[in-house]
A protein has these predicted regions:
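Structural preference for solvent-exposed beta-strand-turn elements
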Residues: 1-226
Length: 226
């Protein structure tokens, strides 16, 4: 029996889709509201199938896929592009290419974190003697955020679902420095994770003097001095 809990924010994050999938596989999970804290009654691997909805987080599908071989599970995925969702597709590619019988495997650098350095290089591009270069940038095509350099300078509109993953937050942070108004769309999932990140971005950019408007799950940012 495993009892899981976390910091207060973790108790707010939605877990229902993952818990429902595990219950479909035959596992008993006790939770008052399908969030942490919860108790999992483990029974070892048991073959079965389930469907997981990734509308609120693709991490649910990635977690199940990584354990599926040992568990004997067949995983169906629905919501927000399903199995073609960028982070789910990356997980599937990793599972396919990882050497099951041992060996050497090169782990790619994290493109989401690397976006900060591309952003810094873009901001400083006109400053003499301040070059920023990023070595060994991922080129496998697995990481959606490896597209970040191609989004500089920022386009008029960027979608979290189709254009960038977590690095869209880096793009939002530098948007006030752009030469034109920029829109960032389909940001809803950012509200559900470490914090309410859409609100946090709008609030903190406004503190710096940026003009930011929030309409539904879209942020619109005007260029200007900070």
């Amino acid at each position: 029996v495993y009892r899981l809990s976390g910091v207060p924010r973790m108790h707010e994050r939605p877990q229902a889709a993952l818990l429902q999938a595990l219950r479909e596989l035959g596992y008993r999970i006790d939770s008052e509201n399908d969030k942490l804290p919860l108790t999992i009654h483990a029974e070892g691997p048991k073959a079965g199938s389930c469907t997981v909805n990734i509308t609120k987080s693709s991490q649910f599908a990635s977690a199940l896929l990584l354990a599926a071989d040992q568990g004997g599970w067949q995983i169906g995925i629905e919501g927000e592009q399903g199995a073609a969702s960028p982070y789910v597709a990356m997980t599937s590619s990793l599972i396919e290419y990882f050497p099951k019988s041992g060996g050497r495997f090169a782990i790619e650098p994290d493109a989401s974190g690397g976006s900060y350095f591309w952003a810094a290089g873009h901001i400083l591009s006109g400053e003499e003697g301040l070059p920023v270069k990023v070595a060994r940038w991922p080129r496998s095509g697995w990481q959606i955020d490896a597209e970040f350099p191609s989004c500089l300078p920022l386009p008029v509109q960027t979608s979290r679902q189709d254009d960038l993953g977590d690095s869209i937050m880096t793009a939002i942070a530098i948007a006030p420095l752009a030469k034109r108004k920029t829109e960032f769309t389909e940001l809803g999932r950012l509200r559900l994770q470490e914090c309410e990140r859409v609100e946090a971005l709008r609030t903190e950019l406004a503190k710096c003097g940026a003009v930011v408007s929030e309409t539904g799950d879209t942020l619109t940012i005007q260029p200007g001095l900070l």
